[in-house]
Amino acid sequence: MASSKLAVIVLAAGMGTRMKSSLPKVMHPLAGRPMVSHLLDTVSGLSPDRMVVVVGPDMELVGKTVAPFPTVIQADRLGTGHAVLQAKAALGQFDGDVLVLYGDTPLITRATLERMLAERRGPRDPAVVVLGFKPQDPGHYGRLVVGAEGLKAIVEYRDATPDQRENPLCNSGVMAIDGNRLWSLIERVDNKNSKGEYYLTDIVALARADGATCTHVEGDEAELLGVNARSELAVAEALVQARLREAAMDNGATLIDPATVWFSWDTKIGRDVTIWPHVVFGPGVTVGDNVEIKGFCHFEGCMVEAGVAAGPFTRLRPGAEIGEGAHIGNFVEVKKATVEAGAKINHLAYVGDARVGAGANVGAGTITCNYDGFNKSFTDIGAGAFIGSNTSLVAPVKVGDGAVVGAGSVITKEVTPGALAVARGSQMELKGWAERFRAQQAAKKAKKD
């Protein structure tokens, strides 16, 4: 009976030269996090007993990202078979199943991996299970040659006959391998090919020569996309977003124009939420039930509680906490601030490093002046307070509960609860001044003429 133990080897040492980037290929983000993290999250759902990530030299950033999973270094990039061999010391003589995956193939699903493991642990006891797929454009993919006895061979496109090239079943590179046979197979792979590399695909022929069976499982092209260029990264992003949008709608959210709403991998959206077109969610956003988010909003690192109305053109930055039933309107930016239940900041305001108390109203053009060039300071607006339009609150400062601040004020001192504070120059009126001024200017102009 096949073992239920599982080890995973993730190959992530590729240079990614086609990306034309100083960032390692597997670190390029999809939905707000590195593509390799998507893969590790999927694999973690299988509860593997061991996992090791194969990286290249000078890839410390990848090592930090995949931690606590261990990494091994492939000092010389001599092919996929050579990369797998680098994991031998970390895995040792593992007697379970070994999945070999690729850090630049981040969209593979847990369901597909479970099907591969079920095949590996099935009655045929195959030494190797290869994940195949049928792309719309088979191009120069290697082909899987399948017969009644299972997978007969993996043929590289350049070595394939015309008939084999007509075969639509292609090789994804993903494999499930019997751990008891893995190292015996890998150590016999040679580099007698045009590239002088050690190909993992050669283990199929070696296993069959040993009298073992090899089989395949077929996956979907969309989940087997390999990201090697920026154009493929864009395709992968679109596929990830399609999944996230579908999940949000399945969980009870309404997306007026789904294609224009962009989620992050960890966005949490409640039920009966309505999201209008052109909304972007950065990482770390939680939205409660019955929230309406109008168009052209950008949220990141924030909490939005039930019944909030936001937008259009609202920006919520990290640390923003918007309380139940609050209104955050057009061209309002909130950063590292708590807006309590029922408060309203309806237009043209900046609220940073602050608290806006329950039921308070912040008028158009109000800003919290939270930075003096060296330090950030806090603004505390009490419950039920009313801040008139075009007010500057110079932190640190406190406006008490129920207080009213007159429009155009520059508040630098504490306003006591229930008080009226007006801090602006007194209005002055000079009767007849405008008429005299116009006459003077007309006379000057006539004299010049």
Swiss-Prot record:
Q: Which residues bind acetyl-CoA?
A: A364, N370, Y371, S389, A407, R424
Whether Transferase counts among this entry's keywords is: yes
Per the record, the pathway is: Nucleotide-sugar biosynthesis; UDP-N-acetyl-alpha-D-glucosamine biosynthesis; N-acetyl-alpha-D-glucosamine 1-phosphate from alpha-D-glucosamine 6-phosphate (route II): step 2/2; Nucleotide-sugar biosynthesis; UDP-N-acetyl-alpha-D-glucosamine biosynthesis; UDP-N-acetyl-alpha-D-glucosamine from N-acetyl-alpha-D-glucosamine 1-phosphate: step 1/1; Bacterial outer membrane biogenesis; LPS lipid A biosynthesis
Region Pyrophosphorylase: start and end of each range? 1-230
Binding note for cofactor = Binds 1 Mg(2+) ion per subunit.
Q: Would you say which domain of life the source belongs to?
A: Bacteria
Q: Where is this region: N-acetyltransferase?
A: 252-449
**Localization per Swiss-Prot or TrEMBL:** Cytoplasm
Name the Gene Ontology biological process terms.
cell morphogenesis; cell wall organization; lipid A biosynthetic process; peptidoglycan biosynthetic process; regulation of cell shape; UDP-N-acetylglucosamine biosynthetic process
EC numbers listed for it are 2.7.7.23, 2.3.1.157
Record's Pfam families?
Hexapep, NTP_transf_3
Binding site residues for UDP-N-acetyl-alpha-D-glucosamine: 11-14, 25, 74, 79-80, 102-104, 142, 156, 171, 228, 317, 335, 350, 361
Task: Give Gene Ontology CC terms.
Answer: cytoplasm; membrane
* The entry's keywords: Acyltransferase, Cell shape, Cell wall biogenesis/degradation, Cytoplasm, Magnesium, Metal-binding, Multifunctional enzyme, Nucleotidyltransferase, Peptidoglycan synthesis, Repeat, Transferase
* List of catalytic residues: H347
Q: Region (Linker) spans which residues?
A: 231-251
- Intrachain S-S bonds: none
Q: Required cofactors, per record?
A: Mg(2+)
GO MF, one term, reads: UDP-N-acetylglucosamine diphosphorylase activity
What this protein is reported to do is described as: Catalyzes the last two sequential reactions in the de novo biosynthetic pathway for UDP-N-acetylglucosamine (UDP-GlcNAc). The C-terminal domain catalyzes the transfer of acetyl group from acetyl coenzyme A to glucosamine-1-phosphate (GlcN-1-P) to produce N-acetylglucosamine-1-phosphate (GlcNAc-1-P), which is converted into UDP-GlcNAc by the transfer of uridine 5-monophosphate (from uridine 5-triphosphate), a reaction catalyzed by the N-terminal domain.
Q: Which proteins does it associate with, and in what oligomeric form?
A: Homotrimer.
NCBIfam families with a match to the protein in the record? glmU, PRK14353.1
Q: What is this protein called?
A: Bifunctional protein GlmU
Origin organism of this chain? Answer: Paramagnetospirillum magneticum (strain ATCC 700264 / AMB-1)
Q: Gene for this protein?
A: glmU
